[in-house]
């Protein structure tokens, strides 16, 4: 999927990855980083007006989103679809030169109205990942369950660290207060979950 997806995209362009804690979103993220394509990690259920404004402001070359949302963007060309996610080519023709070190863009926490984006370089991601792995002594026996969205810095760092050590990631859209979440914890033998105070 990664190779098929990214073969449809020019290197060093901007892609809005509308995130869910599902395999299509995760594989897109991994594929984009490996192919030197810069994802902007946004929540899939972002307010439609806010998303439209961000698209007009940042002019991404592509949108990678849950297939069930693709019809909302019928003015964009459907390029690829698989495992519940669709890649759409936008109609922005102007190309922007992106810094070679830029790996991804994340929104700041608490952004309202018009999210601000934080730049992450490949070196930042690697250094942060190695530091967390070392501090927490993570290894391939770990089985983290996604309790935080992957468009959050904390959520994506859990994914990065566990992939780094060859550990397992249990993807779920269920929340801590849902019975199904705890059933998945048990069924898939999760060893950890992360959270932030409310």
Task: State where each predicted segment sits.
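Proline-aspartate-enriched helix->loop->beta-strand connector
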Residues: 59-63, 190
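Hydrophobic alpha-helical segments in the ANL/AMP-binding
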Residues: 23-41, 52, 132-134, 153-165
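Conserved AMP-binding/adenylate-forming
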Residues: 3-45, 147-149
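Conserved AMP-binding/adenylation subdomain of ANL enzymes
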Residues: 126-143, 153-194
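Conserved pre-ATP/AMP-binding loop-to-beta segment of ANL
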Residues: 90-107, 114, 137-143
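Conserved AMP-binding A3 loop
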Residues: 103-130
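ATP-dependent adenylate-forming carboxylate-activation enzymes
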Residues: 1, 19, 40-55, 69, ...
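Conserved S/T- and glycine-rich ATP-binding loop of Class I adenylate-forming
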Residues: 15, 32, 102, 108-111, ...
């Amino acid at each position: 999927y990664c190779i098929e997806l990214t073969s449809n995209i020019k290197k060093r362009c901007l892609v809005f990855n509308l995130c869910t804690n599902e395999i299509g979103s995760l594989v897109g993220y991994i594929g984009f980083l490996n192919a030197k394509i810069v994802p902007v990690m946004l929540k899939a259920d972002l307010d439609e007006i806010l998303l439209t404004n961000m698209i007009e402001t940042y002019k991404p070359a592509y949108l990678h989103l849950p297939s069930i949302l693709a019809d909302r963007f019928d003015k964009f060309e459907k390029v690829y679809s698989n495992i519940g996610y669709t890649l759409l080519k936008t109609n922005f023709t102007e190309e922007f030169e992106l810094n070679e070190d830029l790996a991804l863009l994340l929104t700041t926490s608490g952004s309202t109205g018009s999210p601000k984006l934080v730049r992450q370089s490949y070196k930042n991601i690697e250094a942060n990942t190695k530091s967390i792995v070392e501090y927490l002594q993570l290894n391939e026996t770990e089985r983290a369950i996604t309790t935080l969205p992957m468009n959050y810095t904390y959520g994506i760092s859990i994914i990065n660290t566990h992939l780094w050590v060859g550990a397992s990631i249990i993807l779920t859209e269920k929340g801590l207060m849902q019975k199904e979440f705890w059933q998945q914890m048990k069924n898939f033998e999760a060893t950890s979950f992360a959270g932030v105070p409310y």
